[in-house]
Amino acid sequence: AYRMMARAGGADVAYSEMVSCAGLHYGGNGSWELTECAEGEPDLAVQLFGTKPELFREAAEGVARRLGTRLVLIDINMACPVPKVTKKGEGAALMETPELAETLVSACVEALAPYGVPVTVKIRRGRYDGRELAPEFARRMEAAGAQAVAVHGRYATQFYHGEAEWDTVRRVAGAVKIPVIGSGDVRDAHEAARMLSETGARAVMVARGSYGNPWVFQQAKDILAGKEPFAPGLVTRIEAFECHMRLLAAIGAHLKRGRSLANWYLKGMPEAAFWRGEANKCTTLEEFLRVSARIKEAMAEAEDHGFETR
């Protein structure tokens, strides 16, 4: 549902959640489900993690066969900072074992060659504070066959605390010939445009900056084209929330997620705290839609009194 909202908002590519190569190998239905396109979803970039080359080769081939032309790329996650991942040598821990990382990339590149699917890598500044590995590591991934590298400007030990160091993105962009994707602290469309202009990145990866604002992608494109960025009105934002909730219901997701979605879509609206409280009582699609209908009624009354809501 999140991916479909992002694509509708102008995103060129949407990624799956991280999928374990071992999970795919041992037949976990839950793992394979993560690699599937939802109904109405045009295509997908699938994000894999693990440490075994043979499992990466098997996973990449399996995903390519299942998705066919809907597979945009395979991304190898070497950026995840979560301890349960890094303690197994996976995710950001791979930045400390570049030879293994090269082998994983090569395995995927070889497996996907018959399908014409590119392999990309996502990395961080490094694993440990003060030990920047990204530029040299990116060069090695390029030599192994990666066709793009996404760079998050924090160390793994920082998780998502502190500020992302965009100069790291710039240094990586200067170190490789393949496209670099900038990531980290891209909170709105203006920051996305600034990331491109200041770092030499060829693309921007946006996550938290799109929460409650799936239009951020088109807004960034507007800014780069010298246009006034699209500014959704309050009613448009509520209608987007309704659409997001219907998508969640359609894929059978737990609808309590709607409570956190409401927090994001309602941010900055009049009486937002009250309406968040109402949304936090909801458990079904019908209940969420009733709350959103009440919000729109309140907005219509406000408009009658001269307040702009569109």
Region locations from a protein language model:
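Short, charged, surface-exposed secondary-structure boundary motifs
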Residues: H25-G27, F159, N213-Q219
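Alpha/beta enzyme core
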Residues: A8, R57-E90, T97-I178
